[in-house]
């Protein structure tokens, strides 16, 4: 952890996103929110780094995150159209196509292996962030705890109590929508209103010019 003046602390974090799980969970709560999660990762990433500050016992100290590793795991067949939004925000993408007729893929295995590999990274990460409601990651969280690493999970929809208990901080889908995605819908609405006002103003100006051109040109002597 890097300490800065005035009680500021920066947590070095590694982020792992189970896209299919989170997108499906958010879609059950709010389809628009799921779309915003998929198409504007930069927004909620900024919230993770600066907006979501870890609670601390000292009122003069707060933590900011520096997400140094960003990895997203998705099914390219079902969700390939969202891939570019994550690459544009410096995510490494792991394609995890379905392996069975039921649509089961290998996301959980790939994520678990990458998380455990990151434990041995030259950069000692203070915190591991897992975006998934899959309780199969419970043993991974317990391993991270044994190595004295802070953990944060974002569950999307409902998650098992044992899974949530294994993490230091739990963000459910409702809080993520309210805080991490807040303002996105309002911004879209404001953009639409602004565009409509511009069109209306342009129409009025064009109408005035047309009327002025048709009026006789009176001159005084």
Task: Show where each model-derived region lies.
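Accessory DNA-binding and partner-docking regions appended to nucleic-acid-acting proteins
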Residues: 219-221
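Nuclease catalytic cores that cleave nucleic-acid phosphodiester bonds
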Residues: 78-215
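Domain-level signal for Mg2+-assisted phosphodiester chemistry and nucleotide/NA-binding surfaces
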Residues: 1-110, 120, 145, 150-152
């Amino acid at each position: 952890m890097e300490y800065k003046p005035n009680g500021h602390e920066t947590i070095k974090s590694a982020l792992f996103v189970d896209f299919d799980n989170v997108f499906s969970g958010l879609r059950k709560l709010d389809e628009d929110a799921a779309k915003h999660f998929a198409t504007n990762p930069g927004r909620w990433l900024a919230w993770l780094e600066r907006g979501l500050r870890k609670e601390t016992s000292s009122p003069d100290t707060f933590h900011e995150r520096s997400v140094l590793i960003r990895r997203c795991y998705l099914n390219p067949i079902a969700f390939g159209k969202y891939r570019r939004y994550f690459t544009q925000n410096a995510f490494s993408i792991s394609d995890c196509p379905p392996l069975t007729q039921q649509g089961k893929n290998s996301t959980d295995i790939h994520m678990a292996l990458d998380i455990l590999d990151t434990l041995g990274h030259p950069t000692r990460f203070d915190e591991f962030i897992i975006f998934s409601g899959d309780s199969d990651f419970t043993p991974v969280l317990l391993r991270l705890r044994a190595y004295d690493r802070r953990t944060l999970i974002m569950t999307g929809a409902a998650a098992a109590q044992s899974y949530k208990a294994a993490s230091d901080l739990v963000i459910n889908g409702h809080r993520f929508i309210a805080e991490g995605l807040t303002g996105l819908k309002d911004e879209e609405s404001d953009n639409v209103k602004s565009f409509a006002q511009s069109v209306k103003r342009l129409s009025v100006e064009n109408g005035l010019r047309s009327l002025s051109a048709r009026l006789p040109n009176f001159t005084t002597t």
